[in-house]
Every structure is written in C-alpha cells, then in structure tokens.
Curated annotation (Swiss-Prot):
This is Shikimate dehydrogenase (NADP(+)). Shikimate binds at residues 14-16, 61, 86, 102, 217. It comes from Thioalkalivibrio sulfidiphilus (strain HL-EbGR7). The gene is aroE. GO terms for molecular function: NADP binding; shikimate 3-dehydrogenase (NADP+) activity. Belongs to the shikimate dehydrogenase family.
Length: 273
C-alpha cells in the first residue's frame, strides 16, 4: 500500500485525509493518507524521514509552501510561477518533484463548479501573500479585463503586480486603491476572515452582478462572506471547493487518475441551519 501525507503546522484541522480517503475509495486506489505535524524548523527533516519510510508524495500546507519550493529537486511550470509548492511527488529515482495545484483548484471551482465568468470581467483580489501569488497566473490565463491586487501594505501588492505584469492586465495597491473600483469577482486571499474581521472595504466595491469568493473555509460563513451578503453580492462561495479541487490535482499527479470532485464536496459541505 502506497503512503501519502499532508504536512503542516498546525495540522489537526486538515480535511485532506478524509478527502483523499474518499478519492481512493471512489477510484479503487490502494493507498493510505495521513496528517503529519512538523516542527517549524523541521520541515525538510520530516520530508526526508517520510521518504526514507517509503512515502510516495505529500501535500504541504501553512507555513511550509516556501520551504517545499526550495526543497524540491525539480519544479513544474505552475510551481515555478507561483514561487511556492503545495504538492510533492517522490519520483522513481527518489528525487522530489514540486507542483502547485492551488491556482488550478481555485479556477476549476470558480468556472466549472460555480459557473463564474472570468473573461472580460474586473477582478479584485485581497491580500498579497503566498496564497494569492499561487492563483494569479491561472486567473490571468482566463483573460479578465483587469485584475487588481489590494493589500494593507500596498508595496507588496505593487511588487506582486510587477511580477505578473507579463501575463495580463494586473495592478496593485493599498486598500485605499479600491476607492472608485467595482469588482465583478472579489476574491479574499487573506486569513482575516477566519479572525472574524474584514479589511475596510468600500461599500460600493461590488458591481451590480458581482460576487465574492473566500479562499478560506469553515463550518459557518466567514466574516468576509457575511460582509458580501450584507453588501448585496449576487453570489458567494467559500474555499471548500478549491480545497477539494486542488486535492484532486495532487491525487491525479500521484496516481494517474482524476477523481470526481462533486460528490466529495457534497459530503464535506456542512448543512447550514
């Protein structure tokens, strides 16, 4: 039986073991998948130990995606562009291939599951950290009219925009740069929503048919999605679908078969009162 794991700090909250168990059952794959806690200064040692124990691949979560990028012996184009790795595959010669499936997971959830149009639309993304960097290239590949990155520290958003300027019409700025803008699609890539707080956003930020997507997820609507509902969002979604879709990309890389994600999302989706 092949063994896989998700590595993080913390890791107890992870839904990945259940997701991959459902994928394995659905596709008839003989594999085990577990959550592994790594010390903040012990990611590389943890990976090496697990590889020595015969593990075939890993998902990587906060805060180790940058370290995984450095540890990988080879990188896919998506990982290189994102500057971060959330999936490692142990190749036949024992070397590590680094991949980033976050952006593909977001785009698949938005376009295929939710039916959101991106081409020719105005996008606003909140945040300028690793989570946002990982999704910019796949979003720009869909041909939005504009993509504006807004962050509390405007310089970080501006630098991120410069890094991706060759891929499409992307700009960056601080939260004040949102004044006068209207978004067809507003994406929260910060963790603020988990802390029951939302960055100060203009009341008229959403276009009349604009919707909101939170890359975070929880058993109840995040603070960001509550803001969205209060400000007339035409649709809202949290990041559960993105989580399942990026997991399916990882699973396909490891096992050579792509699972069906819809049934898994339905199983994991909590019933709202």
């Amino acid at each position: 039986m092949d063994k896989y794991a998700v590595i993080g700090h913390p890791i107890g909250h992870s839904k990945s073991p259940r997701i991959h168990a459902l994928f394995a059952g659905q596709t008839g794959q003989d594999m085990a998948y577990e959550a592994v806690f790594a010390p903040l200064d012990g990611f590389a040692d943890t990976v090496r130990r697990l590889v020595a124990e015969g593990y075939r691949g890993f998902n990587v979560t906060v805060p180790f995606k940058g370290e995984a990028f450095k540890l990988a012996d080879a990188l896919t184009d998506r990982a290189r562009c994102a500057g971060a790795v959330n999936t490692l595959k142990v190749q036949d010669d024992g070397t590590l291939l680094g991949e980033n499936t976050d952006g593909a997971g977001l785009v698949t959830d938005l376009v295929n599951n939710l039916g959101v149009a991106i081409a020719g639309r105005d996008l606003v993304v909140l945040g300028a950290g690793g989570a946002v960097r990982g999704v910019l290239a796949p979003l720009l590949a869909l041909g939005p009219a504009s993509l504006h990155i807004a962050n509390r520290t405007g310089a970080r958003a501006e630098q991120l925009a410069r890094d991706f300027a060759d891929l499409g019409p992307v700009t960056g700025g601080d939260l004040d740069s949102l004044m006068g803008r209207q978004a067809h699609v507003l994406i929260n890539g910060t963790s603020a929503g988990l802390d029951d707080e939302v960055p100060p956003l203009p009341d008229d930020l959403l276009h009349a048919d604009g919707g909101c997507y939170d890359m975070m997820y929880g058993d109840r609507p995040t603070a960001f999605l509550r803001w969205a509902a209060a400000h007339g969002a035409a649709w809202t979604a949290d990041g559960l679908g993105m989580l399942v879709e990026q997991a399916a990309e990882s699973f396909a890389l490891w096992r050579g078969v792509r699972p069906q994600t819809g049934p898994v999302i339905q199983i994991l989706r909590p019933v709202q009162p």
